Amino acid sequence: MKFVLLFGVLLVTLFSYSSAEMLDDFDQADEDELLSLIEKEEARRDCIPKHHECTSNKHGCCRGHLFKYKCQCTTVVTQSGEETERCFCGTPPHHKAAELVVGFGKKIFG
């Protein structure tokens, strides 16, 4: 009888220890997910909105509804005759077409 009682106490102790380890692992996973979400949110805040200048940071455009905006550049001639490159974040034509098709599909199929 003493052996069964001792074995039961040992089993309960091991079970509580293992469940505490699992909970610690779950808590660590939750913290890691939270940190990655915070990093994504910070990156989202730092991005360049649509129609804003992206000349100095060509890969920093924000995401649109379906696609990330692309930095589109043009050459501008100033009044002094000097050519400079000006860039802005925008939606490329093929992305606009895809968004239009998806929009029609959502309207038709609900």
Swiss-Prot record:
Residue stretches in coiled coil: none
Signal peptide: 1-20
Record's keyword annotation contains Disulfide bond: yes
Domain of life: Eukaryota
Presence of the UniProt keyword Magnesium in the record: no
Tissue distribution: Expressed by the venom gland.
GO MF term set: toxin activity
Key words of the record: Disulfide bond, Knottin, Secreted, Signal, Toxin
Protein location: Secreted
Protein's recorded name: U1-lycotoxin-Ls1ee
Entry domain remark: The presence of a 'disulfide through disulfide knot' structurally defines this protein as a knottin.
